């Protein structure tokens, strides 16, 4: 198999793009670096496409390695024919490859292997010949011995040999898989008819294999694991065995009838159970891959949410018995004040005293935004905060933010190192405040799996889920870039080319020597060698550096080109120090991007990227996104919602069958996929994303079950 050619065909890319991408990956270049600084070589492939190519490349290389191992193993048995080798070399998947190896694989003890050990394989050959003149019972008499006491035992042993050979036929297994995928049905039923479980929808359920969607597969799998469901894959009567009969039965002679019996046994006992297991495994893997993709997409949107800059924020971690933990952070995230207020259980004069704790913090620090965790006691805390904000002589607002993972972080070693002087509960309040200020900087400290924007994430294969989510975090951190002098250890460790050891060394160097003054100074950091420097240089900014390019995403290797571009447009480096120059792009277009690229000695994609940085040094791509939705008015409760009511909310989670929207009543409403838009969409992610502010209308409210049905389709007038 020519892997580069296969990748080019699969991804519908030029061969040159694939060849260059493979060369860069094999040279140890990171995906963020390739996506940003090697666009000319890859044809401007983005990080998501590059990751897909890398994953597929690893699979195909693993496939080729396995083919080599199998050919070597069969050759050692003296059974590798040119035809078999050609089939193995041409196999497209690991499953297909293993099918071809199955007849030659060292076997455990089976009915067929025991029959062969008793010398019954020659009898199996006689039966398979299906000679109309052959008398099976007479032929069997020649094989009787101590372990084969009669002709019935001899014929049964011979049929066992045939059944296993039929079930191991690679072409037949492929046909059977196709049949199950096209005509099979997945069925589930309750293990206890009247049991009250979350899986009641699947107590008497059947759906064609080819139509069942991922989230239903995962639900059925979980129900089976928890003992609530029994699950099976079925075929229409007679469909499966007929494949074997058509292939192996030549006539209805006495031998032919025994071969047919062996074929039916092969189907029922060996082939179909194996294909059923494989089919369910394949469905689960497909569903898991899709669910991981949704989780990754949701995480990407959450991490790339617009930060709330230049605001002093109060973080509130709600609670009942232990009170609400409070933390005020300044514009940079530095903790200014902490406290506890028992506002959810106090009454009368006692409640007013507790409110005063928050009042004083709000006024003392001129807090303009409050972040309230959405966990226990959030509702009561929100009511008090909304009331107190109205008393302020200046404008302030609040937002209920997800607490997911905050408790995990606050009890972690990382949090203890960052805030040794605070107890666990106060660290959580700090984290909640910072999540509103800069979601990316705060959420990278938390295991992505704890952030809670997926579906069935606890059922996903851990390694695949972790790799996908870590890739998203890496892409997001590098896309935004970090300030070398203020970035936390967590942020630094996700920068291309920087591992945890180098990240710690950067923080240590900063502590011992003061702030970095330019990018070159980074070379003094222990373990940060030339290769790592090449990978990370463009993603680490130095604000206030003597060379203003050090505060941009322009890679040091392109500084000469950047200065040439400035010169062509009539500017000098000093002209972009600390100020935006939006006119540079327009001037460059007048000169012609192609002409400038030739003079600067770089490609057009690099010129365009450099121009963006020169127009706005230190730019944050998240600033171009809509700001988070803050609330300041009266809060609503579930009972206040009525069908037809128009609301504005924030998408909190996107799943296969819809999205959940926070409309400010503490129960997220579900917009079913059919209610997202008028056009047909296969998946909600085609139309909405996590963090997006959307307009919705109430369809129905179930107060008893605390469920809200919403639509994003405007009501028809008249």
Model-predicted regions and their roles:
Residues 33, 49-52, 59, 63-315, ...:
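Duplex nucleic acid-engaging cores and interfaces of nucleic-acid transaction enzymes
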Residues 178-185, 316-320, 375-380, 401-408, ...:
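A glycine-rich phosphate-binding loop feature that marks nucleotide/adenosyl-phosphate handling sites
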Residues 341-346, 369, 411-424, 453-457, ...:
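Short beta-alpha connecting loops at secondary-structure transitions
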Residues 30-31, 46-145, 149, 337, ...:
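Accessory alpha-helical DNA-binding modules that contact the DNA backbone or grooves
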Residues 278-296, 450-481, 598-639:
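Long, charged amphipathic helices and adjacent flexible linkers at domain junctions
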Residues 96, 399, 405, 410-480, ...:
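Long, charge-rich intrinsically disordered scaffolds of nucleic-acid metabolism proteins
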Residues 139-151, 205-206, 241-267, 271, ...:
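Low-complexity, acidic/Ser/Thr- and charged residue-rich accessory regions of DNA metabolism proteins
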